[in-house]
Amino acid sequence: MKSLLLLSVLAALAVAALCYESHESLESYEINPFLNRRNANTFISPQQRWRAKAQERIRELNKPPYELNREACDDYKLCERYAMVYGYNAAYNRYFRQRPGAK
């Protein structure tokens, strides 16, 4: 009985030691993950924002044809399902290519 009491006291101390909450966790942003607009804009300078937007526009304009075909296919559910089985190239050809003689 004495050993059971000693074991339970040791277990309680172990639980208390392992479950101790330090003050470091209170300093993190996990408590409030959402920032207001003013604080959110301080992370990236306007110069970096402008450069990122310009690079994104350039990437959108210079996409290879297979990427454009894939995006068109992703927007159409039947084409996307067909692509999962036969590939995006075959799916795009089936649903979006002009057929000979068709207008």
Curated annotation (Swiss-Prot):
The modification Phosphoserine is found at residues 22, 25, 28. It is found in: Secreted. Requires vitamin K-dependent gamma-carboxylation for its function. Residues 1-19 form the signal peptide. GO terms for molecular function: calcium ion binding. GO terms for cellular component: extracellular matrix; extracellular region. PROSITE patterns: GLA_1, GLA_2. Associates with the organic matrix of bone and cartilage. Thought to act as an inhibitor of bone formation. This is Matrix Gla protein.
